[in-house]
């Protein structure tokens, strides 16, 4: 009887060990399955992390490029601002220079016109400003005790011989040639300046303040 009980106890122990082994194997299989699933998930996570890292790298590259482009644009805008400010300053300086030049030009013209008026009275010569610079047209008045002598002239401004003849003729009549020539020169300068923006007449293309006069025509007396 005792032997039978011993065998039954042994069988139970063996059976228990067997069942325990089965449970351990089941747990081991379950654990292996979980480990495999974990490894699989971990691999997926690593791949996702790599993909994310690549995307982040591309995004960082784009951000860097955009930042460099933005820096260039900012630098360009700053350069434009500096250039604009410099242009404004140059424009203001130019306006001041132009204003000063105009003022000096008006002053010079007034001085020249005053000189022309004085020389005209001194020499008795009156110039037709409308005929200049193509022609020198006017009259020189020689005042006498009883009557005045008029010497009219309608002169082309490119005749050297005419200028020489006129100068000799007026000089023979005791006209101050230095003042007379200065009067003609100043009147010519004023005419040239006033007509500078427009197309000059063909006859004035080579104008050098040279005068002609026909001395064969008789002089007039009053």
Swiss-Prot record:
It is found in: Nucleus; Chromosome, Centromere, Kinetochore. One of its GO terms (cellular component) is Ndc80 complex. Residues 51-100 form a coiled coil. GO terms for biological process: cell division; meiotic metaphase chromosome alignment; meiotic spindle organization; mitotic metaphase chromosome alignment. Keywords: Cell cycle, Cell division, Centromere, Chromosome, Coiled coil, Kinetochore, Meiosis, Mitosis, Nucleus. Component of the Ndc80 complex, which is composed of Ndc80, Nuf2 and Spc25. Belongs to the SPC25 family. This is Kinetochore protein Spc25. It comes from Drosophila sechellia (Fruit fly).
């Amino acid at each position: 009887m005792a032997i039978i009980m011993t065998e039954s106890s042994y069988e139970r122990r063996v059976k228990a060990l067997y069942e325990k082994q089965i449970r351990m194997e089941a747990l081991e299989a379950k654990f292996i399955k979980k480990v495999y699933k974990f490894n699989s998930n971990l691999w997926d996570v690593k791949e996702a992390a790599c993909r994310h890292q690549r995307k982040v790298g591309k995004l960082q590259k784009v951000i860097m490029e955009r930042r460099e482009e933005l820096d260039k644009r900012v630098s360009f805008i700053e350069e434009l601002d500096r250039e604009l400010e410099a242009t404004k300053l140059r424009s203001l300086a130019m306006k001041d220079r132009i204003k000063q030049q105009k003022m000096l030009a008006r002053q010079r013209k007034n001085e020249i016109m005053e000189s022309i008026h004085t020389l005209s009275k001194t020499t008795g010569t009156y110039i037709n400003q409308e005929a200049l610079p193509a022609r020198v047209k006017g009259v020189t008045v020689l005042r006498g005790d009883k009557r005045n002598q008029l010497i009219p002239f309608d002169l082309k401004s490119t005749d050297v011989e005419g200028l020489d003849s006129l100068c000799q003729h007026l000089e023979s009549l005791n006209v101050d040639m230095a003042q007379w020539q200065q009067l003609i020169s100043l009147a010519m300068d004023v005419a040239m300046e006033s007509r500078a923006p427009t197309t000059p007449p063909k006859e004035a293309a080579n104008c050098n303040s040279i005068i002609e006069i026909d001395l064969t025509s008789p002089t007039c007396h009053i």
